[in-house]
Amino acid sequence: MPASDVPPTHPRYLSLITRERIVAGVERGVTSPHGLIAHGRGEAFDYLLGEATHLFAHEAIAEAAKVLKAARHPVISVNGNACALAAGDLVALAGATGAKLEVNIFHTSAEREQAIRNMLLEAGAREVLMPGRTHAIQHIEHNRKWVHPEGILIADVVFVPLEDGDRCGALVQNGKTVITVDLNPLSRTAKTAQITIVDNLTRCLPLLVQAVQALNTGTTDNANANADNANANANVNVNVNVNANANSLPDRTHAPLYSNSRTLAEAERTLRTGTGN
Ligand code: PTJ
């Protein structure tokens, strides 16, 4: 595919460039053709959410960072869409959390599993676990049941962006704490995971890495202290700049304890009332 000739000044530049990453993923054998459809669905929800990282997503990101940091054996489960969109950030998250990266795909293909592994290695991963065909989690029938014995099989926390509902439910039934990223707050995955970040993977992943790094270095309070207190009210929908950095993260000092059902309710209300834009 020719390099993009979309100028950065195009009003839909980010969206179009992201779309090209998914197309390139298909051409490279990383992403399933079905992934194009999944991406389009994500785009539609993102459009309705104003293509912004809302306060409910920031709260889920902060909770995810804490849970990943406290995990004994965290694993990042990578599929074809996540890899094409964010290989570098997934590797960075593995580095920050000490989590293992494991390939796990819905649409069965040994070649694509290998292509995903290669792309993660190119992005700097030191180790990428493959699902194999010897160990499986329970409560699921299709290809996604296969796991690595040193990865998802023994994981206590699994970060799995763009998951399908069946496997998310199976992971939970297998005793895992599941953190997902899904722009659709109505999906079965969103409702089944313990933590759902309703945001675009490309926006929230750098923020999640940053949140974990802040926990690692003990700078979380400083980041929050610099934040705009007006954003702290969890009952108000706040659009946070797409390129938010540590100094623009909202202050959650007085936010109530994390609740995934509240996150989903706020995301759904934002969608239905059109207040995302
Ligand atoms: O590589 P494979 O074979 O594992 O296939 C991966 C896909 C994503 C194709 C597969 O898991 C699938 O079909 O997923 P679903 O059931 O379509 O769910 C994808 C969910 O992710 C949908 O709810 C989309 O709204 C959401 N989504 C799509 N793109 C993004 C997203 N959420 C966050 N960020 C995105 N960029």
Predicted regions and their residues:
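Electropositive, gly/pro-rich neighborhoods at or near active sites that engage anionic ligands
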Residues: M1-A99, E111, S259-N277
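Alpha-helix C-terminal capping/helix-to-coil transition sites in glycosyltransferase folds
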Residues: A70, L153-I154
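Long, charge-dense
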Residues: A92-K145
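Short gly/pro/ser/thr-enriched loop/turn and capping motifs at secondary-structure boundaries
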Residues: H107-R112, P185-T189, C204-L205
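Active-site glycine-rich loop that binds ribose-phosphate moieties when present
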Residues: T134-L153, F159-D166
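A short, gly/pro- and small-residue-rich
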Residues: G165-L186
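C-terminal functional extensions of proteins
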Residues: R188-N226, N241-N277
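Periodic short-repeat tracts
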Residues: D228, A232-V242
